[in-house]
Structure formats: structure tokens, C-alpha cells
Amino acid sequence: MDNEVVIDVQNLTKSFNDFVAVDSISFDVKKGEIFGLLGPNGAGKSTTLRLLSTLSKPTKGTATIGGYDIVKDDTEVRKLIGIVSEKMIMYDRLTARENLIFFGSLFNIPKDILAKRINELLELVQLTNWKNAKVGTFSTGMRQRMNVIRALLNMPQVMFLDEPTLGLDPQSSVEIREFIKKLNRENRTTIIITTHMMVDADLLCDRIGIMDHAKIVALDTSTNLKKLISGADTTIMKLEIGNLSPDIIEAVRACKCIDAVTQENSTHLRIIAHGDEAFDSVIDAVRAKEGKINSMENLQPTLEDVFLHITGHEVRDSADQKIPMARHGRFGSQPQGRIR
């Protein structure tokens, strides 16, 4: 990664009548960087990718890719980018090679160059031995690798990956993450990833923009984001309570020191709190409801903790499922309503 800015976004906004899907976001992405947009479904991540990939026009604001404006120079922008959407675009009845020949022909790539490129890409994702097999017989992980190299046929400088590990089993997710890192390392491809998966953001991204309610509410490296809640004033604790009940949870949430509370299972609470008296306050609250504390552990912060700390709620699969886990985030009360 170097200091050359490839993507520059300034006050980008997308509205549908009175509904704001992307609300005046600004960020830049440097050449060779893997940049992540992290947040729940409905936060505005995919809409942002649609704007940057010229599939939708912004209501306000500007963005450039490789120096080209996404509205005025949309044709030039499209020559620079590759898009991997959440939906896999492949024809099951065609072989891997036939699929790539078809999609490569849409870019008007000369046949001899396309044939060589297909062989190189199949080798890159370790699918050479399956080049003559029908894609309909592939595992989900293999299909996702095919989906990615389809977007690489035109040798893009910039890749947009929308939820690249969504729906994959753990092993396939690892394979896709390793491939993304290899692509970035060997080709210096600039990559923007949207995800609600903490592990993807943590393991892949050089910098992360946390999105919530159509806004970017924090932007930094994973390490620096975690430092937001790793100071002397903040405590992250895990409690095992043998007789955990709704009354006990509400009593803990009512403590003035509490920033966020998550119930992990039938006996465990994960708590973010502030102040010197945090431990004592939580223990007193549990015991006041006759709770039986079996264990108490001090934890290191995760990106999930950062999201809770900033927004006051968890990252959920759907914006409709967001459940406030405390009275407010440490960065102030959050706007009402849901981004769809």
C-alpha cells in the first residue's frame, strides 16, 4: 500500500424521496489498500458500493476513482473496476471455463489474451483441475471463488466485494479470505469490502469504516478502533451467572457505569462499562437480584465491542433486528428509524 489515493469520496449522499440511504459520507482509499465498510444490513454499505460502481447516481456529493468522476466519467470508471455482488452470477450448466469465456467476451477481450487470462485466474484460485466441470456441481466456496475471478477478467485496478463470505461454511470463508489477501498482495489490487462479519473486517482490512444509520460513525485501523475502548476508564467483562434472569440483566443495564450489555447465552453476559467502580457496581447489581456469580473475567476489546461502544447496539444480520443493548452509546444517543 502506498499514499496514492485511488478512491476519493466527499459528502456522498443517496436519498429516495424523504428516505436517506447514504448520509453525507466521506473517506478515501489508497492504492493497494483493503478498505472495509462494516455494519449491519441496511446501514448503507451496499448502496455505497452501488454508487461507487456507477450502478446508481448520488443525490449529492462527489466521488472519484482513479481520478474519474463516478457521474461525469462513468464509462471510464467502469473500465477500472470489478464487482463481486452478494448474489453469485454463474451459469450452472456451463463449465468453469465456458462461464469465464462467456463473461470475458462481454469485455471484448481478444480470444488469445482471454484464454491465457482464464488459465492464470483458474490457477490463482486453485480450480484448474475443475475447469471442464459444470459450475452446478461446485461447492459454495468454489462457486464464490469463480464469482471473484469472473470480476477479475478485465484486470480491474479496484475491486468491490459485497459480503464476500456470506453464507459460506467456516472452511470456505477461510479460503476466500486467503484468496483476497493473495489477490491484494500479488496484484496490488485496491479492494473495498462490505461486511457485517467482524472476523472479515478484522483479518482482512487495513482500515475500517463503521457504518450505522447511513453514516460512517468511525474510521481507523482495527487496532486503533479497539483503542477507543482499551483506556483506563473502560472495562470489558464477562460474567457467568448461574441463575441469569431478565431481572438481573435489567439491573445490570440500570447501572450508571454501563455502556453496553450483551447476553451471549443462558448464563453469560458481556459488559462494557466505564469508571473505577465498574466491577463493584455490576457485582452489587447482580447480588441485589440474588444472582449467583460463578465467574468473572476481564477481556480485551473486539470490533464487536467497538461497535457496541459507539452505537449502543449490536451488529445484526438485519437492521430490523437491531436491539438496543444499553441506554445509549458512549458517543451520544443514536438517531431513530431504520435504513433499509
Regions flagged by a language model, labelled:
Residues 61-72, 77:
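Conserved ABC transporter NBD signature motif
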Residues 101, 105, 112-130:
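Conserved ABC ATPase "signature" region
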Residues 134-138:
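Conserved ABC ATPase signature
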Residues 155:
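Conserved catalytic motifs of ABC-family nucleotide-binding domains
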Residues 159-162:
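Catalytic Walker B motif of ABC-type/P-loop ATPase nucleotide-binding domains
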Residues 178-274:
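ABC transporter nucleotide-binding domain
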